């Protein structure tokens, strides 16, 4: 929706990208493409962070209750969810609760007032004298995500933080009517927080889907009182090892698949989040360079127990290297080409296998 773009927005284009550009993708654009997604057979949309943040990736939250102005307004998000629901499409949002951005109100208060701040225990600060120091946090002055000084870790063991984040999620449900929450860095959020959050949110929306981003065995988070499911990266890796790296024999591949589905209870496997690529990985087509192998992997994805998820652009075999290049613009001006329509039809047929 170019008419809503500001001066800092670059022209929508195809090809490689970095973390510096803003291309103007927004919620209104997604709303306009709902018929396309419905025709493809999509039944759910997982959105990366949409709350107000400084960066282009939006994993450095400033305001957990406000849609980022680059994407639209709270009212536009509410309308998007409403129209998606009318088409049978559910919406899941990304919750960045492991850490925040440096312009999050409580962190700014801590930087200003140091240990006297009422939010002093909302974070894990080891050296109050150097809390304002710039540069990575390997010196241990405070805990942060990936040692970046722009993403201080939240203390999710703190009862006040737990109450605040429970209120944030409740607002998302009551105001926007979301259907699911994906928890970024889901293995570094406290168990006590997740247990309390689940109790609180299930009393409001019993069928809410809680998904953890965990890249390894997640059994301890899947005991029925925290996450419903996790992103099944072990399956992703196994499929890549067999089809792309050729480091597995067929009996080893069979063992790997069985292991992925015997780690967890059946209730978890029924809704486990299966994927072949994401905003955190190299794109599937970039790894394959071979359409036949590309579609073989998709066929495996869609015949496995759980919830198959394709990354936007996979339906046309969109390429992209590791983050951030995997986050390229969707080439809408090329979507109607014969080649892309043939690819879309193939993916649609795989999706319809699940219906």
PLM features: what roles do these ranges have?
Residues 1-90, 105-109:
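N-terminal structural segment of carbohydrate-active enzymes
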Residues 81-87, 99, 104-115, 170, ...:
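Active-site-proximal helices and loops of the catalytic beta/alpha 8
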Residues 3-9, 56-68, 97-140, 199, ...:
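Aromatic- and acidic-residue-enriched segments that line the glycan-binding/catalytic groove
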Residues 97-99, 150, 163-191, 269, ...:
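Active-site groove signature of glycoside hydrolases
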Residues 45-47, 91-93, 181, 210-212, ...:
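Hydrophobic faces of well-ordered beta-strands that scaffold small-molecule active sites
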Residues 37, 47, 64, 84, ...:
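Conserved, mostly hydrophobic/aromatic
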Residues 266-289, 325:
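Active-site clefts of carbohydrate-active enzymes
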Residues 12-28, 60-74, 147-162, 179-188, ...:
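The substrate-binding groove and active-site-proximal loops of carbohydrate-active enzymes
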């Amino acid at each position: 929706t170019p008419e809503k773009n500001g001066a800092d927005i670059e022209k929508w284009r195809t090809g490689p990208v970095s973390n510096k550009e803003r291309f103007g993708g927004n919620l209104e654009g997604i709303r306009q493409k709902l018929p396309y997604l419905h025709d493809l057979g999509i039944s759910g949309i997982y959105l990366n962070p949409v709350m107000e943040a400084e960066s282009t990736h939006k994993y450095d939250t400033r305001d957990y209750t406000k849609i980022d102005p680059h994407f639209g307004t709270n009212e536009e998000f509410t309308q998007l969810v409403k129209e998606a629901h009318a088409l049978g499409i559910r919406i899941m949002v990304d919750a960045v609760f492991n850490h925040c951005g440096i312009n999050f109100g409580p962190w700014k208060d801590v930087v200003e007032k140091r240990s006297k701040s009422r939010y002093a225990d909302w974070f894990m600060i080891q050296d109050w004298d150097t809390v304002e120091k710039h540069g990575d946090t390997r010196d241990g002055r405070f805990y942060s995500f990936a040692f970046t000084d722009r993403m201080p870790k939240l203390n999710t063991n703190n009862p006040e933080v737990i109450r605040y984040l429970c209120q944030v999620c409740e607002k998302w449900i009551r105001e926007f009517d979301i259907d699911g929450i994906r928890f970024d860095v889901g293995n570094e959020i406290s168990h006590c927080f997740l247990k309390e959050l689940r109790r609180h949110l299930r009393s409001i929306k019993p069928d809410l889907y809680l998904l953890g981003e965990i890249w390894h065995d997640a059994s301890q988070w899947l005991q029925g009182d925290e996450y419903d499911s996790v992103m099944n990266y072990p399956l992703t890796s196994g499929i890549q090892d067999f089809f792309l790296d050729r480091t597995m024999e067929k009996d080893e591949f069979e063992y790997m698949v069985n292991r992925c589905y015997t780690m967890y209870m059946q209730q978890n496997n029924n809704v486990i989040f299966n994927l072949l690529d994401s905003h955190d990985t190299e794109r599937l087509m970039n790894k394959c360079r071979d359409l036949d192998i590309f579609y073989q992997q998709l066929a495996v994805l869609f015949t496995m127990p759980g919830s198959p998820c394709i990354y936007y652009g996979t339906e046309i075999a969109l390429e992209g290297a590791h983050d951030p290049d995997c986050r390229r613009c969707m080439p809408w001006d090329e979507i109607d080409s014969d080649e892309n329509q043939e690819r879309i039809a193939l993916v649609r047929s795989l999706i319809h296998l699940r219906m």
